[in-house]
Amino acid sequence: ILYKIMNLHSKDNKSNLRTGLYIVSTPIGNMLDISNRAIDVLKNSYLILCEDTRISKKLTLKYNINSKLISYHKFNEKKNIEKICFELKQKKIISLISDAGTPTISDPGKILIKECISQNINIFPIPGPSAVTASVSVSGFSEKYFFYGFFPEKTKEIEKKLSEIKDLDSSIVFFISAKKLNRNINIIKKFFLDRDIVICKEITKFYEEFFRCKVSDLKPFKNLKGEITIVISELNNKKKASNNLNESDKKKIKMLVK
């Protein structure tokens, strides 16, 4: 029985691909970074929901995927939910993709997923590329990480949000533009001065680069362009020691007080 359940998703038989909404991860830069299963699901989809049909068309052309592309982004996702759920209720296979990476991670889709959950519509993840996990994997920092999403916009919001997470003892990941990074270096230093940082530029693309330094040594970049993910390290040992007392320290203090 377990074997049969596991093989409901087998690509050897199209009829075994279950109907529902598929959250399909696509390449973040290098077109080869897509799984055979993802291609199979996209080929068998009645519709493919995507942020920008022009971008997704490059992927579907490369892999001979003929499924219809439908524009689905933050400005129309609420409006289209009823129609999408209607098609899903008709036992259709619909895929959701983003311009790059794993859908719903700082991309549209959460509203649709919540609606599918409320209507008992099947939802399946097709795992794959993610700028978040890719950047953490090469950082050399703690595997425990907090993903913030896109770096805040306004100065007051930046100050407020960073003050809330400055003491987290984990790696901290942001998506950020080159201009915004240069503009906010002093604020990053203010809240994360004792940590290390890696700046990941154009991950998996031709101009892929990684810049590593201490936050205290961070300086504005010249001619920095492209998509950027930054990973800030966990607290260093000195900072941890100043913030937390271990059990032996607590016992010693109690003895001294007595």
Predicted regions: what they are:
Residues 5-75:
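Glycine-rich, flexible N-terminal cofactor/catalytic loop recognition
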Residues 8-10, 18, 92-93, 171-258:
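A contiguous loop/helix-start segment that scaffolds small-molecule binding in enzyme catalytic cores
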Residues 27-29, 53-54, 71-78, 129, ...:
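Short, acidic/turn-prone active-site loops that include or flank metal/cofactor-
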Residues 42-48, 121-124, 170-172:
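Short active-site oxyanion
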Residues 66-74, 123, 143-149, 194-201:
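Short hydrophobic/aromatic-enriched beta-strand-loop microsegments
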Residues 84-130:
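Glycine/small-residue-rich loop that forms an oxyanion/phosphate-binding "nest" at active or ligand-binding sites
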Residues 111-168:
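Class I SAM-dependent methyltransferase SAM-binding "motif I" and its flanking Rossmann-like core
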